[in-house]
Every structure is written in C-alpha cells, then in structure tokens.
C-alpha cells in the first residue's frame, strides 16, 4: 500500500461527505465537488475520517489508492479554504483586466486576447500586471492558470511574458560578438 494512501483524510466540521458506490461528493462552505474513484480503490467512511485501501487482484491499485486519497484531500481543502493561483505579466505594455466572465489580456499581439473563465473559477486583477485566480477545484484553477500563461510564456532572454507569481525564469546570456 502506498504511503500516501495509509494516511486517512480527516473531515472537518461543516463538511458533508457522501459516498455512493465509487462516487465521492464533498460539500462545504465554498462549494461542492464530485469525483468518481478508481474501481481498484476501496473507500470507507468512519466517523469524521475517510480511509482508502487498494482492492486485491487489481493491477496498479496501490498507486490508485494514493492518488484517490490525494484527490479527496484536495477536495476537502478546496471546499473549506479554496485554492488560489497568482500570475504576473512582465513586459512593457502587458496588461490584464476583467471583462464580465473573461480575462482580457494585452500581450503585445495586434489584438487583445480574451480568455473565458469556466464555471467554478473567479479572477481579479489587483493591479494591471497581476491576475489572481480562485476556485474550489485545484485542477481547474491550475489548468486555467496554465492556459493563460500559454498565451505568452516567459521568454528566456529578458523574461517577458506571463509567469506564475513564484516562478523563477532562467534567463540566457545574450550572444557575444
């Protein structure tokens, strides 16, 4: 059994967990999430604890048990605290703003780029060069951040582009004569 799967997921007060076969649904103060668990994983709920164990005779069940436990833990954290991802725009004239349910980006193209936000993700721009994405689903928040970053990833010479707030961009030295 994987080390991750051995640790149980504690369910805090105010969080409602429902197990329906292999479907796990978690409701909390910030929202609700539903996820289907791999068939090779056995999920049990005892008091305020979720336990995950691999089923016998299924290949890869050990790894799937650890994955299911990590996903369930992220669901609990998401509905209680939520997830946040910060992006920075580095470059002359690079700006971001919120237009309805979309993020409008001026990234040096001939036209502004508008990225529509999916349901469950909200965005705000504290400054013209910062974007803060928030939501309950860790995977969805990270995917939206990656999609926005992909419009203009940081280039290796000056570091201009869209980057994560904690990202260290490795710059190359310019060509010498």
UniProtKB/Swiss-Prot annotation:
Domain of life of the native organism: Bacteria
Any single GO BP term: cytoplasmic translation
Signal peptide start-end: none
Gene Ontology annotations for the cellular component aspect, listed alphabetically: cytosolic large ribosomal subunit
Ribonucleoprotein found in the keyword field: yes
Keyword line: Ribonucleoprotein, Ribosomal protein, RNA-binding, rRNA-binding
InterPro entries per record: Ribosomal_uL6-like, Ribosomal_uL6-like_a/b-dom_sf, Ribosomal_uL6_a/b-dom, Ribosomal_uL6_bac-type, Ribosomal_uL6_CS
HAMAP family: Ribosomal_uL6_B (MF_01365_B)
General function of this protein: This protein binds to the 23S rRNA, and is important in its secondary structure. It is located near the subunit interface in the base of the L7/L12 stalk, and near the tRNA binding site of the peptidyltransferase center.
Name recorded for this polypeptide: Large ribosomal subunit protein uL6
Gene source species: Aeromonas salmonicida (strain A449)
Gene transcribed to yield this protein: rplF
């Amino acid at each position: 059994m994987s080390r991750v799967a051995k640790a149980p997921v504690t369910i805090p007060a105010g969080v409602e967990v429902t197990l329906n076969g292999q479907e796990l649904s978690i409701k909390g103060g910030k929202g609700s999430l539903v996820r289907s668990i791999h068939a090779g994983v056995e999920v049990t709920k005892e008091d305020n604890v979720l336990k995950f164990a691999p089923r016998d005779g299924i290949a890869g069940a050990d790894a799937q048990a650890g994955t299911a436990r990590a996903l369930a833990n992220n669901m609990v954290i998401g509905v209680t605290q939520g997830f946040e991802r910060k992006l920075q725009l580095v470059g002359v004239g690079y700006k971001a703003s919120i237009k309805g349910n979309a993020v409008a980006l001026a990234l040096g193209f001939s036209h502004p780029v508008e990225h529509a936000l999916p349901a469950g993700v909200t965005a705000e721009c504290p400054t013209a060069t910062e974007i803060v994405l928030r939501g309950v689903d860790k995977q969805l928040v990270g995917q939206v951040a990656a999609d926005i970053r992909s419009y203009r990833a940081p280039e290796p010479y000056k570091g201009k582009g869209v980057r994560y707030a904690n990202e260290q961009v490795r710059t190359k030295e310019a060509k010498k004569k």
